């Protein structure tokens, strides 16, 4: 078993608002192409005469996940693209090689695609998921200091995948270990079982 969330990952997608716990598992991405890039939010500073800092506030960070899939004979791509645009919003779960470790969860993303070709790699599509705030998504929920529900664009979650009928997967999510607090399973409700 691993100590960190590295190695060959599994990527799962689901349209936002799906009625069933059915996720598609994507083909194995190109080696070392899967990554999440955070962009730190802008910092706003109020200064007084003489340059002293009165107050400082940092805006929320933004997140993008990207991976490359080979265009293979007989293997369909996960998204229909029109000049790099993918219609609809998708949930994204990236499970590390060791499923006991936390993986990436984005509860609402827009998806873009960049199609490319080289003689070294052949045909590839780079898919980029830009994370949005997933209002009402219990997997993305946390509670702030005011005891209010807050929905995060990016969360660490332990992801358990079970293969079901028709090549679909059912995913269960847990919070990761936090100090002495053990992982807690997150209960999702779907409108159709």
Segments from the language model and where they lie:
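Beta-strand secondary-structure signal
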Residues: 64-68, 91-93, 126-130
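Mixed-charge, glycine-accented linear interaction segment located at domain edges/termini
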Residues: 105-193
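Short acidic, glycine-rich loop/turn motifs
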Residues: 13-17, 94-100, 175
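Solvent-exposed edge beta-strands and adjacent loop segments
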Residues: 1-71, 108-124
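Beta-strand elements of well-folded, non-transmembrane domains
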Residues: 69-73, 96-100, 131-135
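Short, acidic/charged, Gly/Pro-enriched secondary-structure junctions
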Residues: 77-105
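A short, compositionally biased
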Residues: 4-9, 85-90, 166
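Generic N-terminal simple sequence motifs
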Residues: 34, 98, 178-179
């Amino acid at each position: 078993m691993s100590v960190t969330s590295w190695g060959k990952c599994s990527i799962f997608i689901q349209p936002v608002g799906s009625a069933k716990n059915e996720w598609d598992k994507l083909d194995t991405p190109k080696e070392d192409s899967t990554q999440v890039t955070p962009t730190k939010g802008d910092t706003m500073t109020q200064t007084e005469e003489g340059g002293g800092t009165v107050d400082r506030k940092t805006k929320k960070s933004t997140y993008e996940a990207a991976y490359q899939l080979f265009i293979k004979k007989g293997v369909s791509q996960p998204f229909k693209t029109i000049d790099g645009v993918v219609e609809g919003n998708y949930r994204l779960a990236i499970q590390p090689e060791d499923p006991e470790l936390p993986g990436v969860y984005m509860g609402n993303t827009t998806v873009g695609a960049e199609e490319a070709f080289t003689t070294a790699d052949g045909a590839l599509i780079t898919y980029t998921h830009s994370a949005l705030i997933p209002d009402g998504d219990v997997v993305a929920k946390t509670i702030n200091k005011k005891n209010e529900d807050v929905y995060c664009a990016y969360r660490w979650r332990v992801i358990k995948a079970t293969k079901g009928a028709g090549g679909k997967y059912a995913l269960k999510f847990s919070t990761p270990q936090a100090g002495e607090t053990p992982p807690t399973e997150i209960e999702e409700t779907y409108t159709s079982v």
